[in-house]
Each structure stands twice: as structure tokens, then as C-alpha cells.
UniProtKB/Swiss-Prot annotation:
Species name: Vibrio vulnificus (strain YJ016)
Protein name (database record): Protein Smg homolog
Family from the record: Belongs to the Smg family.
PANTHER family: PROTEIN SMG
HAMAP family, per the entry: Smg
Pfam family, one: DUF494
Taxonomy, superkingdom: Bacteria
């Protein structure tokens, strides 16, 4: 349910260029009217606050200074449980085509692990990646490419 709220917020406010200066109480009321539960709303808003805090974190600038171009990400057992082989392969693919940097990949993994869900699929990962790229300044080209990857798959490719 938390993922549903995040996607709703992203599509309603961020992706549609709607007014981003929304009062949190107003937002909570709107989400309640849309049928979401108070506890899930709270968790989703906290998740978004944590995403915003990541871009100001010193830990992520340390990641970018320490990582070598040829380094390989080793996933913890907990991360592997959440991110199946298809998801991990997709993250690697996005790094190889320069949609994700080491830093943005780690932000994506952090936010994936911050979700409270038992079910997580590749489509969910794509939305999380889009949200992270949107929230990190300087990633406009990567965001556009990721958006194309997401929507091309959804609409089908015409030959």
C-alpha cells in the first residue's frame, strides 16, 4: 500500500507539474479521501522525507569518492531477498548505460530497503529509480532516459 501512495503522489504532484507547495495536512486529507489509510500515509511521507535527506547526506558523497569504475556491488542477504536477480540485473544495466551512478544506485537501494512491503517487483523498482532521479539535482538526462524506459515498456514497442 505504501508503494501505491508513493506512485499516487509522484504522478499527481511531481510528474504532472502540479503545485509542489502543498501543506502536509492538506496532502494527508487528500490521501485519506483517496482511500489510503492514515498509517500508510504517514509511512509514505516519512519515506519521502528520508529520500530528501539522502541528497544532503555526507555518506553519499563519500560513496562517490570511494568507488572505482570497475567495482562490483555486493548485495547483503536482506537486499537480495528484496531485490531479486531481475532487479539487480536491471540496476547493473542502468549503471552500464550511465542512467545510475554509484551514488544514485545506493540511494535507490536505500529507498527500496526503506519500503515496508513483502512484495517487490521490477516495475516497483523502476518507479523508485524515477523518484530518486527526480529528487537529485543534475540528473535530468538520466531521469528522461529512465522515464522513456519505463513508459516504452508499459506502452509496448512498435516495430
Amino acid at each position: 500500500m505504501m508503494m501505491d501512495i508513493l506512485m499516487y503522489l509522484f504522478e499527481t504532484y511531481i510528474h504532472s507539474d502540479a503545485d509542489l507547495q502543498v501543506d502536509q495536512d492538506e496532502l494527508e486529507d487528500e490521501l485519506l479521501r483517496a482511500g489510503f489509510h492514515q498509517q500508510d500515509i504517514y509511512k509514505a511521507l516519512l519515506w519521502l522525507e528520508e529520500l530528501a535527506a539522502l541528497q544532503q547526506s555526507d555518506a553519499h558523497s563519500a560513496i562517490s569518492r570511494c568507488s572505482a569504475v570497475s567495482s562490483t556491488r555486493v548485495y547483503s542477504p536482506k537486499e537480495m531477498q528484496r531485490l531479486d536477480i531481475e532487479c539487480r540485473g536491471f540496476l547493473l544495466f542502468l549503471e552500464q548505460i550511465n542512467v545510475l551512478t554509484t551514488e544514485t544506485r545506493e540511494m535507490v537501494i536505500d529507498r527500496v530497503m526503506g519500503l515496508e512491503t513483502n512484495e517487490f517487483e521490477l516495475e516497483d523498482l523502476k518507479w523508485i529509480i524515477l523518484m530518486v532521479l527526480f529528487n537529485v539535482p543534475g540528473n535530468e538526462n538520466a531521469y528522461t532516459l529512465m522515464e522513456e524506459l519505463l513508459y516504452t515498456k508499459e506502452q509496448g514497442i512498435l516495430h
